[in-house]
């Protein structure tokens, strides 16, 4: 068998796996988690696949709704897939970590089955706490937070609503390939390397956003919720 033929067969097998995931139905399971969290604490999120909604509130408590979404041929076939996805919540008060754990990857088929598994999060956290978030593939919405934010997304869109422009000191947002939009200075750019920069010497909130492929949308929250 030639090398070209081997690569062709490998590609066809991978394509067949994707098509199989596409033919399956979607099932979901929702779980809730909660822990005490103080003002100016740090929430660290490490997610691989799935959307994340985060909202700030005036409560010393972190509440999480985790929706496991799987693709399977039946509800019975979906049940063992839920067990393969692990939501891990550790810590409390000043330092909390939230992670999504997937099944170990096999060297010869590193991405087998990953298209079938994702976790969507809806999170409420103290409005003045800090956030560090990493997501490989998914959209992120953040609203009502005045603490520091460090956001890194490989593939997806990030929308941030700024609750107080007076408290914002630095906003750095950059997309390696994609689109940025903001009503802070009226930015509206697309292509390679678009970015947003805002600086207010009297503010105290720092926001840094990096997106590899996708969009960054930053809005003032003066007029209520925004919708893309």
Predicted regions located by residue number:
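Short acidic/polar N-terminal linker immediately downstream of export determinants
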Residues: 5, 9-13, 18-54, 69-77, ...
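Extended lipid/amphipathic-ligand handling interfaces
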Residues: 50-52, 138, 156-162
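Short, surface-exposed interaction patches in beta-rich subdomains
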Residues: 28-38, 65, 144, 152-153, ...
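Mid-chain, structured segments of secreted extracytoplasmic proteins
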Residues: 66-111
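Surface-exposed, polar helix/loop patches in the mature regions of secreted/periplasmic/lumenal proteins
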Residues: 92-141, 145, 217
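N-terminal hydrophobic targeting signals that begin at the initiator methionine
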Residues: 1-2
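Repetitive beta-strand solenoid architecture
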Residues: 39, 48, 58, 92, ...
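Soluble periplasmic/extracytoplasmic beta-strand elements of cell-envelope proteins
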Residues: 42-46, 53, 63-65, 97-99, ...
